[in-house]
């Protein structure tokens, strides 16, 4: 697949697993490529995910194999376990910043401020205008889209198109449910995104420690 190739259409599990591989490559390099179990844990994280999923091991493994068939994932064998890494950047000819944005959008629709705050550990962006520049490039290639503002929304939101055409009404309804009871305003949105980023950092550190402990146990066996 290249810039002129058809975009693959992913189901919910495939999209979530691919997004996890993209994020964990940057945030927990010592535990990457991911095992099936690590991919399952990452896919079922509840922070800043829409929708929140509870995928079983077999579903995650099947999603990884299908992504491998699409060329978006490559399997590696090390430490006596299957491990998987993504190939999104090379397959679709994307920059690091564009891969990071796709990885974040695979969590669910987000605003520029949320993308900028959550991208801190994935890729370097100068500011939200820089984020917008890379998003515009993805939009031009049919990989992302800007969503119409729903009633009461103050900011534009963006979504990926790796799962085909968007059901805008369903996305807006899901966004409204997720935002119910939260304070409105861009400053609050960005602050919440930074808090969620810190929570994700703690989770990633726990993942890395668990991976290190597993390797130490294997070495001592």
UniProtKB/Swiss-Prot annotation:
Family affiliation? Belongs to the UPF0502 family.
Q: Supply the source organism for this entry.
A: Xanthomonas oryzae pv. oryzae (strain KACC10331 / KXO85)
Taken from the record, one Pfam family name reads: DUF480
Protein name according to UniProt: UPF0502 protein XOO0245
Write down the superkingdom of origin: Bacteria
Q: List the disulfide bonds.
A: none
